[in-house]
């Protein structure tokens, strides 16, 4: 029977593709105030500024390719059931060939209505659509006439895919965490839902507090650490 692996990824897995991290020294939040460009308050205060920020992110992503870590994770699907749970809003896992990716914080290549289409549906997936790498501007309207906004979970908003992610971790035989400092909640608590018999591997070059004796820390960058993990599976 194929092993089921839940792969939780953060900004570190895309850093080697040239996409900046957020919280590290020199990261995006050193240049931009997240409360201005990535919070629900910032959106209502100055939506044009938020749209410009994500237009810039989309343009950069258009020129960015997945790295070996993304590709090795996708390759694991040949022998294992792989559930990728990513904190990243890029599409590099999909570009690499991963077929089951849960985006906890949304996707930069997608948009949805600013206002709910109705009280029951909220931002139902049927109202979310892919704009690829195109720009979105003030005045671009959704089908219900409201302003289009990035399909991003802003600071100050709930994480709607969290329950889905928890369910995937609970079913996993192995949990692999790549490129996240486990500082961003609620995602940082996901590994705690792993089964008692499920080993947990963390790939991160920085020191990581180990809260569980099942955790093995592979202290390497994503490409090198995922390669080591894959070798251990063989």
Language-model features, listed with the residues they occupy:
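Conserved catalytic core of sirtuin-type NAD+-dependent deacylases
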Residues: 1-234
């Amino acid at each position: 029977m194929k092993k089921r692996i839940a792969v939780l990824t953060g900004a570190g897995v895309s850093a080697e593709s040239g996409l900046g991290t957020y919280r590290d020294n020199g990261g995006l939040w050193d240049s931009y105030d997240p409360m201005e460009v990535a919070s629900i308050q910032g959106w209502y205060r100055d939506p044009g500024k938020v749209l410009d920020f994500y237009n810039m992110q989309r343009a950069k992503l258009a020129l960015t390719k997945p790295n070996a870590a993304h590709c090795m994770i996708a390759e694991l699907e040949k022998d294992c059931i792989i559930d990728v749970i990513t904190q990243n809003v890029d599409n590099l896992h999909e570009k690499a060939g991963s077929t089951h990716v849960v985006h906890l914080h949304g996707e930069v290549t997608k948009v949805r209505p600013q206002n709910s289409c109705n009280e029951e549906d909220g931002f139902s997936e049927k109202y979310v659509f892919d704009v690829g790498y195109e720009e979105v501007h003030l005045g671009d309207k959704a089908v219900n006439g409201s302003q289009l906004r990035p399909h991003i979970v802003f600071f100050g908003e709930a994480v709607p895919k969290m329950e889905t992610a928890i369910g995937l971790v609970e079913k996993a035989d192995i949990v692999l965490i790549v490129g996240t400092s486990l500082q961003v909640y609620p995602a940082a608590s996901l590994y705690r839902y792993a089964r008692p018999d499920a080993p947990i591997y963390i790939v991160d070059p920085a020191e990581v507090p180990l809260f569980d004796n099942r955790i093995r820390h592979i202290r390497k960058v994503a490409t090198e650490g995922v390669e080591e993990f894959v070798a251990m599976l063989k």
